[in-house]
Each structure stands twice: as structure tokens, then as C-alpha cells.
């Protein structure tokens, strides 16, 4: 089965696409969203294979949503748009495909056929992974999306419910990015299997008898350090 998530702020547009997709035996619609906050949360929770994403939405566009998703776990993106084919060329590098509104059944069939072919090759995504260093981390919290500058990030932690970013002020937000992505694309250092820390916020390292340690940050918060990563942290501060 191909798991599909529909994101469009227009209820009628979502309904029309839903009706077309429900006629496909191998398609499972796992959810529908009307805005960016709902969409990012649903992608993390539902892990769809394909995201049918409207480009023009209030406040945060479909293009911006794509940039907030973790490249390592990003689904196939099929943009939905009322733009003509000349404008669409600007979007092709970001998407697996696009569909013009109103969506034609024959055109949708072509998209689904291509998706089936790609899945049979076990390709995870057609989107190129951007390996440039991140200047900020996209976070969600309290029904909003905000960009936390790297200088303001104190540490990042991974839990059963996802990955969370803690700011220098102690405020916490959820991010779609994985620890692995953040470790490779930010200055954050691994100090524990479930933690990354911004060494610029470090005040002291408190050593323990069992060979482990604890980081004390300038905001008073503490971060655990496992024996495996203690040596690299000491080297990072010149010890």
C-alpha cells in the first residue's frame, strides 16, 4: 500500500482529490491537513509515502513546508497548484511531480504510475539532500512554526515522541529533523546517544565516579554525557 497525506487549505480541493484516490486499490489516505502546522506534525506521526501538497496556502506555503521536513525521511512530494506550466518549471527541482488544479483523473493516473515504478526500485525520495550547514532549526510549538537560530540552541534531545530543541532560555520546541541530520549539518556535538549540545552554552563539565559526566549549561540546565562521548567533548574544549 502507498500511504498518502493530503495537505490543502481548501476543503473542496481535499475532497476532490480524496475521491479520485479512493478509487485506487493500493492507495491508503492516512490523513488530511489544512495548514503547515498540521502537516509537519502529521508527516512525523503518520510517515506517509507521498505528500500531496498545495503550494499556495496562507502564511506558510507548500514550498516552505518542504524545506522544514527532514531530508532523510521526506516523502515523495506532489505539488498541487493553479499555476500554469511555465511557472511550474521553477518548482520541479523540489518535487517528484505536480498536478494542475482542477486535477484531471488521467493526469493523476500518470503520477501514480510513476510513484509505483519508483517504489518498486525502493527509492526513498527523488528530492536531493541538501548538505549545506543549517543556520537555524525549524521548530513547532503552541500551534506555530518558528525558526530557532543556531546561536540560540542550547541542546537537542531525542525521545519516544520525537526530537526536541531546547533554547538558551529553556524553551522547548519539536523539530522534524533527526539527531543524525542535526549532527552532520550543525555545530552541535554528540554527548549522548539521545543528546546533542551546543558547546558555546557550556559552563562546566561535572565528572562522576562511574566514568560518565554531566554538562552544566549557562542557563542552569543539565545534559547527560555518556562515557563513549566524554573524550571527544574534552578534546572540543582543548583538554
UniProtKB/Swiss-Prot annotation:
Residues 137-239 form the HTH LytTR-type domain. Member of the two-component regulatory system BtsS/BtsR. BtsR regulates expression of btsT by binding to its promoter region. Phosphorylated by BtsS. This is Transcriptional regulatory protein BtsR. SUPFAM superfamilies: CheY-like. Keywords: DNA-binding, Phosphoprotein, Transcription, Transcription regulation, Two-component regulatory system. It comes from the Bacteria. One of its GO terms (molecular function) is DNA binding. InterPro entries: CheY-like_superfamily, LytR-like, LytTR_DNA-bd_dom, Sig_transdc_resp-reg_receiver. The modification 4-aspartylphosphate is found at residue 54. Residues 3-116 form the Response regulatory domain. NCBIfam families: PRK11697.1 (NF008677). Gene3D superfamilies: 3.40.50.2300, LytTr DNA-binding domain.
Amino acid at each position: 500500500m502507498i500511504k498518502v497525506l493530503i495537505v490543502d487549505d481548501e476543503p473542496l480541493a481535499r475532497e476532490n482529490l480524496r475521491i479520485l484516490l479512493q478509487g485506487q486499490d493500493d492507495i491508503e489516505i492516512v490523513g488530511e491537513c489544512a495548514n503547515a502546522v498540521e502537516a509537519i506534525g502529521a508527516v512525523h506521526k503518520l510517515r506517509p509515502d507521498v505528500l500531496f501538497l498545495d503550494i499556495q496556502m496562507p502564511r506558510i506555503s507548500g514550498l516552505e513546508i518542504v524545506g522544514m521536513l527532514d531530508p532523510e525521511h521526506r516523502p515523495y512530494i506532489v505539488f498541487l497548484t493553479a499555476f500554469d506550466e511555465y511557472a511550474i518549471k521553477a518548482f520541479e527541482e523540489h518535487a517528484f511531480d505536480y498536478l494542475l488544479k482542477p486535477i484531471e483523473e488521467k493526469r493523476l493516473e500518470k503520477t501514480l504510475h510513476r510513484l509505483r515504478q519508483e517504489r518498486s526500485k525502493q527509492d526513498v525520495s527523488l528530492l536531493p539532500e541538501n548538505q549545506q550547514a543549517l543556520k537555524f532549526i525549524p521548530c513547532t510549538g503552541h500551534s506555530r512554526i518558528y525558526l530557532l537560530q543556531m546561536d540560540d540552541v542550547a541542546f537537542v534531545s531525542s525521545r519516544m515522541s520525537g526530537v526536541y530543541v531546547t533554547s538558551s532560555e529553556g524553551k522547548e520546541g519539536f523539530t522534524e529533523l533527526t539527531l543524525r541530520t542535526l549532527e552532520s549539518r550543525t555545530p552541535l556535538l554528540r554527548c549522548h546517544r539521545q543528546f546533542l549540545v551546543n558547546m558555546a552554552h557550556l559552563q562546566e563539565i561535572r565528572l562522576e565516579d562511574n566514568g560518565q559526566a554531566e554538562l552544566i549549561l549557562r542557563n542552569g540546565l543539565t545534559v547527560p554525557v555518556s562515557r563513549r562521548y566524554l573524550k571527544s567533548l574534552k578534546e572540543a574544549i582543548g583538554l
